[in-house]
């Protein structure tokens, strides 16, 4: 991949997410120390994981999509590596949850989980694709359609899937039930958590199998985008349930609603 495409594909969505946090005043509501800790852990773990597993996924990242690898390596390169990546991707959210002080809200967990997953994915992609920076701004060897498909997978599908999974797990870690509902629907809540865990594991296992399978490029892109849609749908359902059943803020109906821009 050309250097410019690598940079945009790796950093595009993380930068958009940071801009989203800024515009939604998340930096005002969330401790900046926790945000910095989450991002730093994601970068360190992403680079370390990329260096550790570079040989195992070299063909997946260093040659055109669809080239495939030997069938006997599917279990290791197609399942073990993606699942290990998923577990490490969640470490920033787990560490931040352990060090968290103060009240917990599901939306805070979503932000922390998605931020950790996006920084992990971006750092891992940059570390793995760094040798390809030598191709310069233009790559005259790879066909354009192959570059666009790879950019769609590395720059759109993978980070969106990571953000969906990380945000979902973060939401679960920060979810707090009100005292009046602690013992209500306990079986239902546990069943939802089990389903979420199964969906997350299945998504990342399937992503790895898709990467190592000998499939046409457009088919791989379509499968990646399908799994991304499933991850985002699971995030939507999980976040909706968490917001409905978590501890609600005190209501002050008699207070005026102020403009967010001028405070009047």
List each language-model region with its residue ranges.
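Hydrophobic alpha-helical segments at protein termini of multi-pass membrane proteins
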Residues: 1-264
């Amino acid at each position: 991949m050309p250097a410019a495409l690598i940079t945009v594909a790796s950093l595009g969505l993380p930068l958009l997410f940071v801009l989203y946090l800024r515009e939604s005043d998340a930096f005002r509501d969330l401790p900046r120390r926790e945000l910095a800790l989450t991002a730093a852990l994601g970068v360190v773990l992403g680079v370390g994981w990329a260096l550790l597993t570079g040989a195992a996924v070299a063909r997946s990242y260093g040659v055109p999509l669809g080239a495939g690898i030997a069938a006997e390596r599917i279990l290791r390169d197609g399942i073990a590596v993606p699942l290990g990546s998923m577990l490490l991707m969640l470490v920033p959210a787990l560490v931040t949850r352990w060090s968290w002080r103060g009240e917990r809200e599901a939306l805070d967990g979503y932000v922390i989980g998605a931020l950790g997953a996006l920084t992990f994915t971006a750092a891992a992609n940059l570390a793995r694709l760094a040798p390809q920076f030598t191709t310069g701004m233009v790559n005259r060897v790879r066909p354009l359609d192959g570059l666009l498909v790879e950019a769609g997978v590395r720059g759109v599908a993978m980070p969106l899937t990571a953000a969906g999974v990380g945000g979902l797990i973060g939401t679960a870690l920060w979810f707090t039930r009100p005292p009046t509902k602690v013992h209500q629907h306990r079986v239902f809540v546990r069943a939802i958590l089990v389903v979420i865990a199964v969906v997350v594991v299945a998504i990342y296992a399937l992503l790895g199998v898709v990467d190592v399978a000998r499939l046409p490029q457009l088919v791989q892109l379509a499968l990646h985008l399908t799994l991304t849609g499933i991850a985002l749908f699971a995030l939507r359902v999980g976040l909706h349930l968490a917001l409905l059943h978590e501890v609600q803020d005190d209501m002050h109906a008699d207070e005026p609603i102020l403009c967010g821009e001028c405070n009047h």
